[in-house]
Amino acid sequence: DVCDSLVDGRCIHNGCYCERDAPNGNCCNTDGCTARWWCPGTKWD
């Protein structure tokens, strides 16, 4: 899945904290950062 938006443009996905305005524009999933938003870490953070 991609992230689900929760609060103020932030989202959480499987323990991953994501930010809309982060440089890469995507979010970590099981294979790395391939979903819509970026996250500073991994799925298992």
Swiss-Prot record:
Keywords: Bromination, Disulfide bond, Hydroxylation, Ion channel impairing toxin, Neurotoxin, Secreted, Toxin
Molecular function via GO: ion channel regulator activity; toxin activity
GO cellular component: extracellular region
Domain notes: The cysteine framework is XII (C-C-C-C-CC-C-C).
Sites of 6'-bromotryptophan modification: W37, W38, W44
Residues with the 4-hydroxyproline modification: P23, P40
Tissues expressing the protein: Expressed by the venom duct.
Disulfide bonds: C3-C16, C11-C28, C18-C33, C27-C39
Purpose: Mu-conotoxins block voltage-gated sodium channels. This toxin reversibly blocks voltage-gated sodium channel in cephalopods, with no alteration in the voltage dependence of sodium conductance or on the kinetics of inactivation.
Domain of life: Eukaryota
Subcellular location field: Secreted
Protein name in the entry: Mu-conotoxin-like Cal 12.1.2b
Chief place of localization: secreted
